[in-house]
Amino acid sequence: MAEEHQNRLQNAVDSMVKSLERDNIRKMQGKMFRCSAQCCEDNGASMQQVHHCIERCHTPLAQAQSLVTTELERFQNRLSRCTMNCSDQAKDAFDSGSKEAQVKAQLEGCVIKCAEEHMNLIPSMTKKLKDALAQADK
């Protein structure tokens, strides 16, 4: 049961990342490559000037990718803290004499709750990332 919820959560995150890549990141990659190509077409520029030009072209994309990575890490850390809390509660219950089957059921219920709570965070995280990527693409 908990595994099913974990898979649903993973699929939702994967879907969000694919959507961000398709709708936002890919467009930024295209701009970056076109911008970089223009840098290379400047026959009057030195090698160093071309290099700096290409770096400037790459900056918005690098910032966008970093933003997505940071937000996903935050989400993962938050989920990990939630499941660690479940594990701690289960250990405490077991140490206080609860039966193993009861502790397993409590742990599973708690992990399912974590997954459901984090599923509910995905739409707002998606909106936040899409808004930030749209801003970075200006």
Swiss-Prot record:
InterPro entries: DUF842_euk (IPR008560). It comes from the Eukaryota. One of its GO terms (cellular component) is cytoplasm. Belongs to the FAM136 family. This is Protein FAM136A. It comes from Xenopus laevis.
